[in-house]
Amino acid sequence: HYVDICDDWEPTIEMMGLDQDAQLNDVLAIIGMGASPGISNLLARLVCEELETVEDLFTVWPVDAGERGDAIEKAVQENKGTSGAIIHWMQQISGEIDLIENGKQVSRPPMQAIELQYPGLGSGSGYTVGHPEPLTLAKSMGISGNSANLMLMQSATAAFITNLGKRINQGKTSIEDAALQVGSPSPMGKLKAALSQSRYPKANDLPPFFAWGKGTINNEQFVVAARITSSPPAMDSATAWPLAIALQQLLESRAEGVGVHAPEKIIDLGHFFDAFAKCSEPPMSGADEIVEIVREKL
């Protein structure tokens, strides 16, 4: 069997195409079982279980906004400038990415601001980035509207990253050079971002990591959101623990079946969040404490 933490939407499409081969060979493959994708997919499934029909569905993670929005900063520090993760990020904020519009997979430029109204916390904006979640969730959750993966950023960061993406698209800088500029931005790059940041909406009080859906309950429109209230302290552990728990489910036959599956289709949610709660910081007692689901009638 097979489990990975792939966060690239293009290989995800290719791997989903191997579903029949996996079934014929009695192989169970769980793809994208990290933090995002991974936990994000499971939160999205919890959102969809609250709704009778699903119109829009978004998964959201922090770049440099929110309590634990330091993933990119830590990656830069630990790799003295750049890394495979930063190079991959530059690929996903330039060119075009696939996401879901009106229930269909389409290609669009990244770094588009999407405003979400979070029940009880108000509205804030995230920015589209190339990721697997919308492509697998559209099929597994029956989305009729829009779906994308969003990043939470400070306005100046959004301006800087958007400008980097434009320079990549115009052939003025390479993916690799852009990745280096993330860790060591030029004075001109910082100045341009500072001058244009007012045009980029903020995350405001949105939580750092959540799934958000809009749909119907009893023929009435609702917004539902699910977030984790604690997590492991660093990007590597927040990615590794979900993979380890998925492997445990494979070994204990909690995740059963054959074929290629995204996390939302195959993972035992109760067991997963009970286990994840115990390896978070601060540790939580179980699924009921580490997951918070809220909803609001529109």
Listing of model-derived features with the role each one plays in the protein:
Residues 19-24, 46-52:
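Short, surface-exposed basic-aromatic patches at helix termini and helix-loop junctions that form
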Residues 49-298:
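C-terminal catalytic/substrate-binding lobe primarily of soluble NAD(P)-dependent oxidoreductases
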Residues 16-19, 44-45, 72-75:
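Short, glycine/charged-enriched secondary-structure capping and boundary segments
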Residues 5-28:
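Rossmann-fold NAD(P)-binding glycine/threonine-rich loop
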Residues 31-43, 48, 242, 246:
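Short alpha-helices
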Residues 8-13, 36-39, 62-68:
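Short gly/pro/ser/thr-enriched loop/turn and capping motifs at secondary-structure boundaries
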